[in-house]
Amino acid sequence: TAYDNAVIKASCNGYLSIVKYLVSQGANIRAKNDRAVILASENGHLDVVKYLVVLGVNIRVDNDCAIRWASLHGHLEVVKYLVSQGANIRAENNFAVEWASRNGHREIVDYLISLDSRIKVKCVFSVRSRHKSFHNPIHRLSYIDID
């Protein structure tokens, strides 16, 4: 419907009331391969993610894309919720833990490791450049061992 793109954008931006309104008007929350839940997860909008899950989105779509992007962007509560709903933390060759590590999201790394003892990460750290022209953190993963 005409509302499908709008519900994806509202989910991406965390506008739960707008998402609810669009759903009431017939928006397809599963449009474009469940893009709404993926973008809500990527941007840390837990309330939107929960609402979409209740309505029946597939959090495991696109090889567990939702948990991978939530981990990459450091949204621990979203990661925990997705795990509670059956997300696969080892999807795409352990993308979630590897990219959480590379981006300095230690809490997510610790959480994911606590769920699967076969994942071992050593020497994860984040360094900020002292050069004024660099505003983004530079992250380094020196060693990851996944059985």
Curated annotation (Swiss-Prot):
Keywords: ANK repeat, Repeat. The keyword Repeat applies. ANK repeats lie at residues 2-31, 32-61, 62-91, 93-121. PROSITE patterns: ANK_REP_REGION, ANK_REPEAT. It comes from Acanthamoeba polyphaga mimivirus (APMV). InterPro entries: Ankyrin_rpt, Ankyrin_rpt-contain_sf. Gene3D superfamilies: Ankyrin repeat-containing domain (1.25.40.20). This is Putative ankyrin repeat protein R847.
